[in-house]
Amino acid sequence: MVVTALAFDFTNGFHDTGNAMATSIATGALKPKVAVGLSAALNLVGAFLSVEVAATVAKGIVNLDKVNIGPGDGKNHMLLLIVFCGLVGGILWNLLTWLFGLPSSSSHALFGGLIGAALISLGKDGVVWGGVVGKIIIPAVLAPIVAGIVSAIATALVYLITRKVEHEKQIKGFRWGQILSASLISLSHGTNDAQKTMGVIFLALVAYGRVNPEDGIPVWVKICCALAIALGTYIGGWRVIRTLGKGLVEIESPQGMAAEMATASVILTSSHFGLALSTTHVATGSILGTGLGRKNAEVRWGVAGRMVIAWIITLPAAAIVGALTYLLGHYIGLYNEVLGVIVVFIILVIAASYIFYRSLKTPVNANNVNDDWDDHKSSKDSRASKLSTCLLYTSPSP
């Protein structure tokens, strides 16, 4: 269970590296490998700064009052299976959207998986709907809008204030500023996203009877989650970095700094209040805002539209995966509880291996991440469009 949770944390790290470093890489403020190394180090530090979001995940999604702790050793196999299948849903969605370079929300993939598994096992009362709506869905809608507005205003002010500065000096100066602003995003990403995995592991520990629901997050959990997300970040999710850095808006350094400062401020504020924001949503909103704030900037609304479609279907798609894997694990588990988990884990490994194999056919790495978007746009956009269309037609009607 802990290994699977840390695997999710790892995919979260490399999937969401683009949130922090895409604009700095796109403008040349940081070399690609230096950028992901810096981001990894700061994600590691950020994971230790707060636990408010971890509390939201641990106690604000699955209704622990509806789960009866088992007798004897206190192990609750139902809760363990809910958590495990939620993680499987989150990991598979992360890998699938990474393959297509779609900056979807790792957080919502995890939440969707947990919600689906909880619904199928405990019914509608098994989900804390107040927490889901108040601390997940509403912030998901408002955060990119707020970030976009802040970023657009900041971009307009930056160009207004520096309008008399020579263009080359302006670009050079803001590149240095981007190093600071990108670092703040990485720090804020650690404070927000690593905590989500901490919350999941905490749920597993509750199921095992190792901790009480009222206890705090153990130190060893914080350390493991911090290391996993840092390692994933260092590996670098180049496909998503490319989409955010080159696919939405052609970004100059002043825009990059404005977008990054807007992203960092929104995420850090939300972490303080325990809001489980998607850093992907915030970063994307900020980047779009820079396109609106700079005169004559080109915004690729087609790419943005496909991202929004992926955002909308992330929760239900991951919930379906979580629910189906729970059913599979549960019914096999009627004969042998461990066997059910093993079968689901094998399916996860096979699916992940296939996705990785597919990614080798169209490699994106530090050497080509900054290539002009038009060089690959038609093939990449068509794949992303097919994914979005397929998922729309396979998602259940409300």
Residue ranges and their predicted role:
Residues 393-398:
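Conserved small/polar residues in nucleotide/adenosyl-binding loops
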